[in-house]
């Protein structure tokens, strides 16, 4: 067989196709290999096609709910994604000195394009903000939070009784159940 018989454009396209196929196979193998110890559906371990199929068919939520029962508390749902239903794993991942970095998912919590403690991706900035506000969460700041909320609820109830009367109406003016859809 003489190589001069081949068209130069055909050789170029064959080379491009070989490089593309090689790249796809190599990237699929590397993405599978990194999280190979975490069980899950095989198609989910090598590509995002498994997630796309679940989204398109509208069964993402029921499928994801069943995965921990089938594969265990930590399940691989994509080449770079894992799912857990174990609170201890979540505490470990989101812990104070966790080595797991935050990803872009947390940016969705921004309010009017301003970052806050829950939306910062940089762990050091997140920890700095957290150390400033932790006093409000640990209960050692001397504020009787339950008593303060209880007194505000009592004030609200007394104000409602004062302005609307103490007796409830026999029938409300509008009925939200009429506008809702009953399930069979």
Swiss-Prot record:
> Which residues fall in a compositionally biased region of kind Low complexity?
173-184
Annotated Gene Ontology cellular components are:
membrane
Instruction: Tell me its applications.
Output: Loline alkaloids show broad-spectrum anti-insect activity, and different lolines may have different biological activities. In vitro tests of NFL, NAL, NML, and semisynthetic loline derivatives with long carbon-chain acylations on the 1-amine have shown that many are effective against both fall armyworm larvae and European corn borer larvae, but the effects seem to differ depending on the modifications. N-Formylloline reduces the weight gain of fall armyworms by deterring feeding, and does not significantly affect corn borers.
Induction statement: Expression is induced in loline alkaloid-producing cultures as well as in planta.
- Region Disordered: list its residue ranges: 161-184
Give the way it sits in the membrane: Single-pass membrane protein
Question: Which Gene Ontology BP terms does the record give?
Answer: alkaloid metabolic process
Q: Where in the cell is it found?
A: Membrane
Which keywords has UniProt assigned to this entry? Alkaloid metabolism, Membrane, Transmembrane, Transmembrane helix
The keyword Magnesium belongs to this UniProt entry's keyword annotation: no
Role? Cytochrome P450 monooxygenase; part of the gene cluster that mediates the biosynthesis of loline alkaloids, potent insecticidal agents composed of a pyrrolizidine ring system and an uncommon ether bridge linking carbons 2 and 7. Lolines are structurally differentiated by the various modifications of the L-amino group and include norloline, loline, N-methylloline, N-acetylloline, N-acetylnorloline, and N-formylloline.
> What's the name of the protein?
Inactive cytochrome P450 monooxygenase lolP2
């Amino acid at each position: 067989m003489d190589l001069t018989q081949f068209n130069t454009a055909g050789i170029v396209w064959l080379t491009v196709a070989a490089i593309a196929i090689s790249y796809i196979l190599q990237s699929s193998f590397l993405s599978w290999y990194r999280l190979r110890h975490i069980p899950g559906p095989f198609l989910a371990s090598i590509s995002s096609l498994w997630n796309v199929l679940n989204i398109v068919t509208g069964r993402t939520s029921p499928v994801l709910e069943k995965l921990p029962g089938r594969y265990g508390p930590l399940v691989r749902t994509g080449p770079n994604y894992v799912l857990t239903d174990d609170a201890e794993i979540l505490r470990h991942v989101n812990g104070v000195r966790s080595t797991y970095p935050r990803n872009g998912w947390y940016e969705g919590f921004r309010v009017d394009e301003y970052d806050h403690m829950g939306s910062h991706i940089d762990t050091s900035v997140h920890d700095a903000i957290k150390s400033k506000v932790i006093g409000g969460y640990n209960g050692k700041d001397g504020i009787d939070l339950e008593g303060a909320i209880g007194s505000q609820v009592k004030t609200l109830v007394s104000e409602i009784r004062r302005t609307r009367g103490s007796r409830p109406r026999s029938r409300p003016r509008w009925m939200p159940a009429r506008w809702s859809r009953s399930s069979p």
